[in-house]
Amino acid sequence: MEVKILKVGKNELSLEIKGEDYTLLNLLQKTLLEDKMVEAAGSKIPHRLLETAIFSLRVKGGRNPFDALYEALDRIKAETLEFREAFEKALKEYQAGG
């Protein structure tokens, strides 16, 4: 995966992301939109054969778009860690016959 910053404004940010499809980007979008200070977040893939996506983020009232992105990534990381721990527990129970 490669990420390139295309545009940075006071309340907005656009990224070009190579080697990624909607799977990760939809999760990122959903997580960002849970933040009440995020006005809009979304992605588009201009051509499906190029494997390049454009991700855009717009925040409200002086919120730093980089901070919003970092916080969303931290929440995603925490959720995946929580899932991993729950899965490992379930696997141990299954292997123990329960």
Predicted regions span which residues?
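Protein-protein interaction/assembly regions in multi-subunit complexes
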Residues: 1-98
